[in-house]
Amino acid sequence: AFNRRSASAASAKVASWRRIGNNTIPATAKAGGQYLNSILAKVEAEKSGYQEAILLNEQGYVADGSGENIFVVKDGILTTPPVAASILEGITRNTIIALAMEEGIPVREHNIGRSEIYFADEVFVTGTAAEVCPINEIDDHLLGPPGPITRRLQGRFFAITAGKDARSADWLYYADGK
């Protein structure tokens, strides 16, 4: 996982390591041992000159990043793998789905084939540390700069987390009690 608020986009590599399946450890459990294959995938990606890894599940579908959920935009539709695809459920993922729906962006949870990420209009990952990070290259396939849907959702997310989005003020709780 990484924090990319200051970066324009990141490169990613589809890892040779697979996401741990639901029949091994419940994928919804945020268990420390479950992150081992994510660490291996991340190291593999970095050794190959990429900033992030994308893991496939046991069926060969896109699951998630090394510590992030993944979203793909094609023809204006935002797609993310379903929970049944052995993904790690994420609060940031749920937030982006809710924001997209508020913004009138069609959202679907659907299995994503490896080739779909190469030919997507936009790809981004989300997570507590990554927040909303555009992906501009996957396995030497250039996707280009962050697209309009990614920028729109990223901007809205950043405004919310900075306390500058009145529409979502009830989403925030200030630790100092104010």
Residue ranges and their predicted role:
Residues A1-K178:
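Helix-start/capping segments and mature chain N-termini
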